[in-house]
Amino acid sequence: MRYIVVDLEATCWEDVRDYDRMEIIEIGAVELPAADSFPTREFSRFVRPTIEPELSPFCQQLTTIRQRDVDRASEFPAVFAEFVEWTGDEPFVLCSWGGYDLTQFRIDCDRHGLSLPKSFERHVNLKKEFARLAGLRKSCGMKGALSHLGLPLEGTHHRGIDDARNIARIAAVILPRLSPLSD
């Protein structure tokens, strides 16, 4: 079974979490050909937001994504089509750190009149599974999980592709311990 580890970055504002306004601005993903394998392929694209095309200063500082990065990017429908094509026809399990990424995919698909592919329905919330397997009372962030495992953060936190790579490192510990996920 293949695993696609995805991390999204979205428009954001200081002290405001408004899901109706948030739009995906980066899709980062890595493919794990098996639960205990290393990433073999990567997908990294910026997305041009349409509701509020100007990134807030807070968003730019948090993500290090610059205005020119999203200005040069395609809008969500085109980038999402590329991502779906990249995932391929073979079955896979979509993995993310928490439920946010899958929710944001649904929101952006609905906003643009797109259907979320059925293949995205097989999803593992790695944040929840990590807390369960580590015996934690409360889930922790990605950086906390890396620290718990004795792994350093690599790359830039809150960048889709870098976070996807880091989450894949955590996934390599978690996925082999989960019940087998069949086709």
For each feature predicted by the language model, list its residue ranges.
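Metal-dependent phosphoesterase signature
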Residues: 61-80
